[in-house]
């Protein structure tokens, strides 16, 4: 009795791992933002909040890739969200590029968080475009989904962080 080939499942596994690592990177970014806000007392400015929303939307695309498998639609969500986040980050970088301007908030390794945000969004665009090219064979008709407990926990943690960020924004700005 012939068995079903497992090449799709096995060859899709590196993509699954890379998408999980990208989602973990988004979670770390949101945690660092929370640390600066809650522990160091640096209240985020409106542009910072928009960058966090961009991060959450990028994370949503990666979470969908982890949960449902790689998809061109998921990568499009990631790329469009990262372009928007990069635009907001670049706007903030350009606001503080004047001579003598010390920037907004604390610096991490010499760069402010909005500069790191721009770098991260641009890296996300490049990574997602590369994955979109590499994952084409897995997107065409592959309906096998790799789901692990670690992936589910990571998605849950991301959703919890996103809810925390949205709650923080509502408490900071109000609903109106």
Features from the language model and the residues they span:
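Short cysteine/histidine-rich metal-coordination sites, predominantly Zn2+-binding motifs
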Residues: 61-68
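Short cysteine clusters
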Residues: 45-48
């Amino acid at each position: 009795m012939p068995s079903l080939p497992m090449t799709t499942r096995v060859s899709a596994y590196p993509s699954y791992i890379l998408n999980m690592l990208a989602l973990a990177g988004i979670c770390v970014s949101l945690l660092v933002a929370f640390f600066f806000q809650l522990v160091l007392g640096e209240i985020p400015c409106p542009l910072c909040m928009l960058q966090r929303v961009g991060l959450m939307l990028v994370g949503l695309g990666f979470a969908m890739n982890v949960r449902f498998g790689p998809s061109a639609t998921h990568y499009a969500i990631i790329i469009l969200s990262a372009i928007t986040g990069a635009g907001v980050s670049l706007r903030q970088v350009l606001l503080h590029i004047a001579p003598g301007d010390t920037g907004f908030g604390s610096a991490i390794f010499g760069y402010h968080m909005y500069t790191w945000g721009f770098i991260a969004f641009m890296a996300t665009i490049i990574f997602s475009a590369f994955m979109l090219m590499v994952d084409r064979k897995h997107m065409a008709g592959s309906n096998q989904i790799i789901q692990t407990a670690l992936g589910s926990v990571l998605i849950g943690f991301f959703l919890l962080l996103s809810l925390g960020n949205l709650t923080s924004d509502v408490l900071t700005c109000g609903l109106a």
